[in-house]
Regions:
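Amphipathic alpha-helical segments within well-ordered protein domains
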Residues: 36-40, 51-55, 69, 73, ...
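Short, well-structured N-terminal submotif of metal-dependent ribonuclease cores
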Residues: 1-31, 40-52, 119
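A generic structural signal for short hydrophobic patches within well-formed alpha-helices
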Residues: 9, 36-39, 107-108
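Active-site neighborhoods of divalent-metal-dependent phosphate/nucleic-acid chemistry enzymes
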Residues: 12, 18, 59-121
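Short, acidic/turn-prone active-site loops that include or flank metal/cofactor-
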Residues: 34-36, 56-58, 106
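A generic, residue-level signal for flexible/boundary positions that often mark functional hotspots
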Residues: 7, 54, 76-79
Length: 121
């Protein structure tokens, strides 16, 4: 199972990423409600179909507000240019013990530092 970041989904919806298609076919993709929410804010072709498909994917564990605050402190994630949604996704991947796939450079550094990075190979 892999938690897939919004940046990967956007890339996939524009250009079709074969590695993501393979993971989807293997039922190995987890989603987070914040990723679905971020995508819902964009202009999507086949909007309802895409959002419904995302909602049908397995969901990663969802960190509570308190867990996120503790996660920030425990891993010294303040001042790294990450947003609250980024931290929620990192915490969820860590709580779920699954890798996190992103192409956002700041987020990728944090994911790599936490040892939960996913690389399409």
């Amino acid at each position: 199972m892999v938690l897939v970041d919004t940046s990967i989904w956007i890339s996939h919806l524009r250009d079709n990423r074969p590695a993501l298609v393979e993971l989807l076919n293997q039922v190995s993709v987890a989603c987070h409600p914040f990723v679905t929410g971020e995508l819902a804010l964009g202009n999507l072709k086949n909007r309802r179909e895409i959002l419904t498909s995302l909602e049908r994917l397995p969901t990663s564990e969802i960190a509570t507000h308190q867990e996120v605050l503790e996660f920030i402190e425990a891993r010294a994630l303040m001042g790294k240019g990450l947003g609250l949604i980024d931290i929620h996704l990192l915490a969820s991947a860590k709580l779920s013990s699954i890798p996190f796939w992103t192409q956002d450079q700041r987020l990728l550094k944090a994911v790599t530092d936490l040892g939960i990075d996913y690389s399409e190979t």
